[in-house]
């Protein structure tokens, strides 16, 4: 409800449609409604994601692993697949798929095997879509964000575990900066693509992590 209210008064208004990205039937229904309402699809931003309990590898429940994979990886695939189908068949042909990756697509944080594995997989999916989409003017990009100041990212300002076992407060960036990065990627002509962009707090301990 909170998300749906964000763009309700904008002109043109932003329509919110509830869907379970991990459910194939729900995703098909979502994209069918988009196609029926607007006639075409130019941009998909795969932004749904979740973490898993930060516990030792041998303590992570199978259900927690599967839930993270279902939303982060399978959900992104199902949405990309549905978008690809529309973009391939529409006229003019083409479109752009932008996947929300993560700094964790490059280097893990301690006790994050499920999240890290899915984000590494997103990188492989991005490259494959970029390759398979060439023939249909479908571009695919990935945005890897480090420490956005959101309700979830607020934990960085309170201290998070580091690879050396220490707890460190990390800097964050305004989430609006991430939005501007997505908007720039989306604004490019289809013959131009940013395959991968990393946006992060300048002083976050990422380079050299691991």
Where are these regions (language model features)?
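Active-site helix of classical SDR
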Residues: 80, 118
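Alpha-helical segment proximal to the catalytic Tyr-Lys
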Residues: 85, 131-134
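Active-site loop immediately N-terminal to the catalytic Tyr-X3-Lys motif
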Residues: 58, 107-113, 170
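C-terminal helical subdomain
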Residues: 142-143, 161-208
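Substrate-binding pocket helix/loop in short-chain dehydrogenase/reductase
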Residues: 55-57, 64-66
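Residue(s) in the substrate-gating loop at a strand-loop-helix junction
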Residues: 102
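The beta1-alpha1 cofactor-binding region of Rossmann-like NAD(H)/NADP(H)-dependent oxidoreductases
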Residues: 18-29, 62
């Amino acid at each position: 409800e909170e998300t749906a209210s964000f763009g309700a008064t904008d002109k043109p208004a932003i329509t919110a449609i509830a869907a379970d990205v991990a459910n194939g039937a729900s995703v098909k229904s979502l994209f069918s409604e988009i196609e029926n309402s607007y006639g075409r699809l130019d941009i998909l931003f795969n932004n749904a994601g979740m973490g898993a309990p930060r516990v030792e590898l041998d303590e992570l429940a199978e259900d927690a692993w599967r839930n993270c994979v279902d939303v982060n990886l399978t959900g992104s695939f199902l949405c990309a697949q549905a978008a690809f189908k529309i973009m391939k068949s529409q006229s003019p042909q083409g479109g752009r798929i932008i996947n929300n990756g993560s700094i964790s697509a490059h280097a893990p944080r301690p006790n994050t095997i499920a999240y890290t594995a899915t984000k590494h997989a997103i990188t492989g999916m991005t490259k494959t879509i970029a390759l398979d989409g060439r023939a249909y003017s479908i571009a695919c990009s990935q945005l890897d964000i480090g420490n956005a100041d959101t309700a979830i990212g607020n934990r960085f300002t309170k201290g998070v575990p580091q690879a050396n076992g220490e707890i460190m407060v990390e800097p964050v960036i305004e989430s609006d900066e991430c939005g501007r990065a997505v908007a720039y990627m989306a604004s490019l002509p289809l013959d131009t693509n940013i395959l991968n962009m990393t946006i992060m707090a300048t002083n976050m301990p990422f380079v050299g992590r691991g």
